């Protein structure tokens, strides 16, 4: 049963975190007649620009969150970012609020330690060897045990912040400091992972819905400093590797529970599949599905959350996405070259509407469909490269 927005019968969805992914979720929810409320720590965030109303609050602050949730009384609370008081979400769920997909899933996946221990120690999924450290002394010992090269990440961060690879002993102190600087919330610990010489990495978008579990065609992606730069779909895989990735994705998403879309990341080495991470919500690499699939990851998430059916997920065309990044720190920006980007065959452009910029901030994405993935990747890079993010004088 779906009510009428802005009436007593309204079905209300509250987004906690209002970036570009939250914006698309809000748009899809509104297509189903859902009343939407956007919450983030800064004003004019992308999802706030399309929601029915919005609130600015520090979502790590329990009291601030409680005030807004009591005021709005949402039917669905949908976390989109890591910097949320997830312990309070567990309390809210016990009080009868519905957290998407579940409060436990949100709590575990906001913290790399929680999800890694669940995957590797409880579910026996293959992962890179790992250690955790709270002090520089523990960190140095962990690096020695894991060996070089190794990958360093804060246990809580977003968009690749604080991630680096230690290749030589000279990198150790820099990596520790960088990880601490990139941490979000209370996540002061870091994870030290053995470097896997993988052939490629994928995101397997996995949907838990009223009719079971479904998978999108695998998405390949390229990262720099842990932050996504481009993605493409489908990623060619052997049948054996794909079947194993789907098996592991089902195991981890069943353990987390609830309904919704999960972005499950894997390293692939031949036919061997290593679990990396999981996000219980749409994934940045999955933005390519806005061009390639009959239902985007955002529509799939909203359908699953609302208990609506999800028939066959179809790949309509090979395609790719490529990010548009800011170069400077500015209070207001404008975009030039959009018309040139849209002249690239098969291209679409999404500008996120972020209120300000900083170096490397993701401000938009170019989406391209083409007869094959290689062509789509080249054209997406070309389209994104034509867009310039410029300060408003």
Swiss-Prot record:
<feature type="binding site">
    <location>
        <position position="112"/>
    </location>
    <ligand>
        <name>ATP</name>
    </ligand>
</feature>
<feature type="binding site">
    <location>
        <position position="354"/>
    </location>
    <ligand>
        <name>N(1)-(5-phospho-beta-D-ribosyl)glycinamide</name>
    </ligand>
</feature>
<dbReference type="InterPro" id="IPR013815">
    <property type="entry name" value="ATP_grasp_subdomain_1"/>
</dbReference>
<keyword id="KW-0479">Metal-binding</keyword>
<dbReference type="GO" id="GO:0004644">
    <property type="term" value="F:phosphoribosylglycinamide formyltransferase activity"/>
</dbReference>
<dbReference type="Pfam" id="PF21244">
    <property type="entry name" value="PurT_C"/>
</dbReference>
<feature type="binding site">
    <location>
        <position position="80"/>
    </location>
    <ligand>
        <name>N(1)-(5-phospho-beta-D-ribosyl)glycinamide</name>
    </ligand>
</feature>
<keyword id="KW-0460">Magnesium</keyword>
<keyword id="KW-0547">Nucleotide-binding</keyword>
<comment type="similarity">
    <text>Belongs to the PurK/PurT family.</text>
</comment>
<feature type="binding site">
    <location>
        <position position="265"/>
    </location>
    <ligand>
        <name>Mg(2+)</name>
    </ligand>
</feature>
<keyword id="KW-0436">Ligase</keyword>
<feature type="binding site">
    <location>
        <begin position="193"/>
        <end position="196"/>
    </location>
    <ligand>
        <name>ATP</name>
    </ligand>
</feature>
<dbReference type="GO" id="GO:0005524">
    <property type="term" value="F:ATP binding"/>
</dbReference>
<dbReference type="GO" id="GO:0000287">
    <property type="term" value="F:magnesium ion binding"/>
</dbReference>
<feature type="domain" description="ATP-grasp">
    <location>
        <begin position="117"/>
        <end position="306"/>
    </location>
</feature>
<dbReference type="Pfam" id="PF22660">
    <property type="entry name" value="RS_preATP-grasp-like"/>
</dbReference>
<dbReference type="GO" id="GO:0043815">
    <property type="term" value="F:phosphoribosylglycinamide formyltransferase 2 activity"/>
</dbReference>
<dbReference type="InterPro" id="IPR003135">
    <property type="entry name" value="ATP-grasp_carboxylate-amine"/>
</dbReference>
<keyword id="KW-0658">Purine biosynthesis</keyword>
<comment type="subunit">
    <text>Homodimer.</text>
</comment>
<dbReference type="GO" id="GO:0006189">
    <property type="term" value="P:'de novo' IMP biosynthetic process"/>
</dbReference>
<dbReference type="InterPro" id="IPR048740">
    <property type="entry name" value="PurT_C"/>
</dbReference>
<protein>
    <recommendedName>
        <fullName>Formate-dependent phosphoribosylglycinamide formyltransferase</fullName>
        <ecNumber>6.3.1.21</ecNumber>
    </recommendedName>
</protein>
<dbReference type="InterPro" id="IPR016185">
    <property type="entry name" value="PreATP-grasp_dom_sf"/>
</dbReference>
<dbReference type="GO" id="GO:0005829">
    <property type="term" value="C:cytosol"/>
</dbReference>
<feature type="binding site">
    <location>
        <position position="277"/>
    </location>
    <ligand>
        <name>Mg(2+)</name>
    </ligand>
</feature>
<dbReference type="InterPro" id="IPR005862">
    <property type="entry name" value="PurT"/>
</dbReference>
<feature type="binding site">
    <location>
        <begin position="158"/>
        <end position="163"/>
    </location>
    <ligand>
        <name>ATP</name>
    </ligand>
</feature>
<feature type="binding site">
    <location>
        <position position="284"/>
    </location>
    <ligand>
        <name>N(1)-(5-phospho-beta-D-ribosyl)glycinamide</name>
    </ligand>
</feature>
<dbReference type="InterPro" id="IPR011054">
    <property type="entry name" value="Rudment_hybrid_motif"/>
</dbReference>
<dbReference type="InterPro" id="IPR054350">
    <property type="entry name" value="PurT/PurK_preATP-grasp"/>
</dbReference>
<dbReference type="Pfam" id="PF02222">
    <property type="entry name" value="ATP-grasp"/>
</dbReference>
<keyword id="KW-0067">ATP-binding</keyword>
<comment type="pathway">
    <text>Purine metabolism; IMP biosynthesis via de novo pathway; N(2)-formyl-N(1)-(5-phospho-D-ribosyl)glycinamide from N(1)-(5-phospho-D-ribosyl)glycinamide (formate route): step 1/1.</text>
</comment>
<feature type="binding site">
    <location>
        <position position="153"/>
    </location>
    <ligand>
        <name>ATP</name>
    </ligand>
</feature>
<feature type="binding site">
    <location>
        <position position="201"/>
    </location>
    <ligand>
        <name>ATP</name>
    </ligand>
</feature>
<feature type="binding site">
    <location>
        <begin position="361"/>
        <end position="362"/>
    </location>
    <ligand>
        <name>N(1)-(5-phospho-beta-D-ribosyl)glycinamide</name>
    </ligand>
</feature>
<dbReference type="InterPro" id="IPR011761">
    <property type="entry name" value="ATP-grasp"/>
</dbReference>
<comment type="function">
    <text>Involved in the de novo purine biosynthesis. Catalyzes the transfer of formate to 5-phospho-ribosyl-glycinamide (GAR), producing 5-phospho-ribosyl-N-formylglycinamide (FGAR). Formate is provided by PurU via hydrolysis of 10-formyl-tetrahydrofolate.</text>
</comment>
<feature type="binding site">
    <location>
        <begin position="20"/>
        <end position="21"/>
    </location>
    <ligand>
        <name>N(1)-(5-phospho-beta-D-ribosyl)glycinamide</name>
    </ligand>
</feature>
